[in-house]
Every structure is written in C-alpha cells, then in structure tokens.
C-alpha cells in the first residue's frame, strides 16, 4: 500500500497540468505550463506499438523499466526514494518526450513497456535548465553552431532483457527517425556509455575512438572534468581496428555506424557505474544506408 501511495504521488502529474505532491509532504507547487506538442504518429507493427508516452501510467512504466535495468541489473547507486518507488526519474523527465515500445500481448502483463528512449529538444531544454549531457560535457560549440530547436538529445535508452535481439531498438530508431523529420532535427547528441569505471581496462577502446571518430573542431565537445588520462596512447592501436570496434558496447557501435562522432574526453559517472562519452550525430551526415532505411 505504501508503494502504491508513493507511486501515485511520484506520477509527474504536472505533465498533465496538475500539481505534484511529493512523498509525505502536503506541500505542492505550481509547475511550468506545458508546451504543446506536435502530433506524433503512433506506429503499430505486429504485437508492438511505438508512441510517445501521454499518460502518467505509461511514463511510470518507462521509469520502472529504466530502474530495473540501471539500478537492479547494472548496479547504479540508488537513492532511498528510488528504492521505495522502484522508478528511475529526474527533473528532466518532466519536460522531455518519452518514446516507448509497448508489447500488447506479453503474457500476464497488459501493455508492457519493453523499450524506451528519452527525447529532449534544445528549445525545450533551454527553458528548463539544459540538457542532461551538459552536466558532464561542455556543449558550447554545438549550441553556438545550431538553432537550439534543431538539436535533439537522446538519453535513458533501455530495452527489457527478454527483447534484446535488435527488434525493439530498430523500432525505437524508426520512431526517432519520424521525430527527426517532424521537428527537422539537424543534430543528435547524448551520452553513450562503457559499463564500469576502470579507465585503464578501456585504454584500447578509448584510444581507438579518439583516433578514428573525433568530432571536427568547430563542434568539438570537451568533458567538464580533466579526462586526458594516459590511456590515449597510439601504442594501444596495434590491435586491428575492426577487432576493437566489435568489442564496443552495442549502443556506441550503433551511433558510429550511422555516422556519429565522439567527444574529446570522457566522464566517469560513479553513481551509474559508467564511463560516459558524448556522441554527436549530424543528421546530414547519417550514413546513406541508414538514411534510406529510416529517414526516407
């Protein structure tokens, strides 16, 4: 019963124009008015529905999936409130769009959310405190180079462990492509991660990425902390580039395949037990194969 009460209070009801009562305090506060969204098409393929969450129950299901993966599976450090509610949430959730994939026929669970991505456009982020990525990386060059309305941050990507055969991530990217076209997005950015915080173990991978996938100077991105560790060593590149590439995390490989580039440095996130890179994709530079597959 306590869990249900907490979930009801932590429902981000301000998304629907109400007040938020936080945990045991009766204090409520007025939130920013909601910015009207453009109509986003709901995509149905077989048993799956891909859409933007537009109900508090859908958002809570996405947050529950995130919690199960980031905190239970990946062992991120949880706060007391998150342990009680079993939801992953932060202040950015209240102004972001939440892309979800629903399995309509998952046995025993109606309308199960099995995949999610959080989307934040630059004009929205600038009104509510900025991108999540800007808490780890200096995005000045990108913000100075693009109309903020044309920048889209991707984050909080996760897929249920029973659905990691590539299908759900493909569906999410189909929907992201629709979002890109709808809002005429010119650049994608976000944090892509290596699990763990031991930099030395990743010396080959980090050296390979810096040597082969660095951003051009005019939109270069720097870590907010000094991450020029001695791991960046060309001697680490004796191993075949292909052999290093195939060992990269799937999400990083995916971004690189479509034409992404990475930040000059990295950020160690001890709370999430990750080493983060900022990945940037200029949509005009998306590889032709993927542009034909998703954007045409």
Question: Over which residues does each language-model region extend?
Answer:
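Conserved N-terminal entry element of GNAT/NAT acetyltransferase domains
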Residues: 4-56
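Basic, polyanion-binding surface patches
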Residues: 292
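Short loop segments at secondary-structure junctions
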Residues: 104-106, 123, 162-163, 283-286
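Short amphipathic alpha-helix that is part of the acyltransferase structural core
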Residues: 38-114, 118-123
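Acyl-donor binding region in acyl/amide transferases
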Residues: 119-261, 266-275
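C-terminal "cap" of GNAT-fold acetyltransferases
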Residues: 273-285
